[in-house]
């Protein structure tokens, strides 16, 4: 409501992030879990079925964010139309914006890459669940669930030769607890075994442990089982 009051005929989120202005300029890569559908079609809506006005991405972009993970438990909050509206909004962002999380449900090969200072990053994004909502009918795009090992393994194998650093967002765990559960541990280790370099965990809304894991091929993987999110 405050953002609407400030913007008049639009939403202005800048004041909410004013204290962060300039902070992210010091980093080469700024990644963010966008845990609501951002779009220009649906009215703004809160818990439990979220919708965020498109103006939020102007603020986030100006703060320095360029990489956005879109796969989480709220990805299906507005059904097929919500997916379409959100993807259309992100597609209209500047060319240096990278998103991942809504995959072509036939090929699963709309991969996301970013090259910074000569280093190529590959990004994948998955979720443990979508609050019980199934993949909507009438959409060509959707999320990949973390227990779909066959699809995930193929995506990792496809991307691995094309990037120097492969980063996976894993939306999983239990909200409101600092304790890492068995599903998180097992999933993180499995991802490490597939050759992932970095695992960024989201969903619990609190900070959990960071750790180095050794994959099946002797590779070393850094995992942060909960990172900061915006919702």
Question: Which residues does each predicted region cover?
Answer:
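Acidic, metal/ion-coordinating pockets
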Residues: 1-231
């Amino acid at each position: 409501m405050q953002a609407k009051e400030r913007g008049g005929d639009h939403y202005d989120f800048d004041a909410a992030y004013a204290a962060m202005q300039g902070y992210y300029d010091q980093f080469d890569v700024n990644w963010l879990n966008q845990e609501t559908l951002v779009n220009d079609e649906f009215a703004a809506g809160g818990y439990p079925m979220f919708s965020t006005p498109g103006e939020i991405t102007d603020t986030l972009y100006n703060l320095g964010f360029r990489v956005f993970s879109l796969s989480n438990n709220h990805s299906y909050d507005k059904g097929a139309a919500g997916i379409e509206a959100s993807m259309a909004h992100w597609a209209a962002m500047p060319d240096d914006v990278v998103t991942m999380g809504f995959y072509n449900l036939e090929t699963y090969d709309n991969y996301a890459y970013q090259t910074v200072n000569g280093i190529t990053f590959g990004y994948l994004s998955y979720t443990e669940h979508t609050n019980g909502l199934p993949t909507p009918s009438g959409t060509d795009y959707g999320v990949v669930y973390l227990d779909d090992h066959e699809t995930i393994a193929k995506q990792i194998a496809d991307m691995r030769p094309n990037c120097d650093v492969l980063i996976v967002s894993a939306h999983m765990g239990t909200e409101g607890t600092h304790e890492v559960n068995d599903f998180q541990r097992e999933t993180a280790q499995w991802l490490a075994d597939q050759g992932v370099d970095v695992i960024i965990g989201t969903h619990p809304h609190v900070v959990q442990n960071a750790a180095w894991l050794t994959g099946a091929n002797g590779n070393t993987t850094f995992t942060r089982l909960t990172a900061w999110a915006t919702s």
